[in-house]
Amino acid sequence: STFPQPFSAARKTMNLIAKLLPTSNVQVDQDASSKKRVFEQAGIMFENNQGIGRSTVFDSLFAREKLGSTGLGQGVAIPHGRIKGLKEAVGAFLRLAAPVQFDAPDGKPVNLLFVLLVPEQATEQHLQILSELAQMFSDRAFRDQLTAAADAAAIHALFTSWEPHAASERRAAV
């Protein structure tokens, strides 16, 4: 690599999400009338950008959702699924034009979704990714910034610049 080692090492520990969310996988103000439509749109995006079949994505997300809602509350959901043959985790972020019902624990409809696809064999890293996403989305300031961001590039920048420690320090200071 052309960067001195400390820079790339710091970059790696910064956040897992930055590595698995390409800018092309950020969609803003999507129209979706239901949870199913959201999964269909995610499928189309992963098919167009990563070559993962849309029906494979849809079926995987839907199967996981049947086990229990991936809605976290506060208008956020993290639908996720396992994909046979996938080599490494990949994510997508959708901000919906209007929120959809998601059977979230607080009953609130969802308009911020991070869709995560992981290889069939679960690893510790996948749990770390989900944990980091939950931490990100529990940060009210971060949710507000995602909602207010002008476009996909601005949202992508929020995800890549987010730091776990900064969020917990902000919460502690409240």
Range-by-range predicted roles:
Residues 3-174:
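Cytosolic covalent-transfer regions centered on His/Cys nucleophiles
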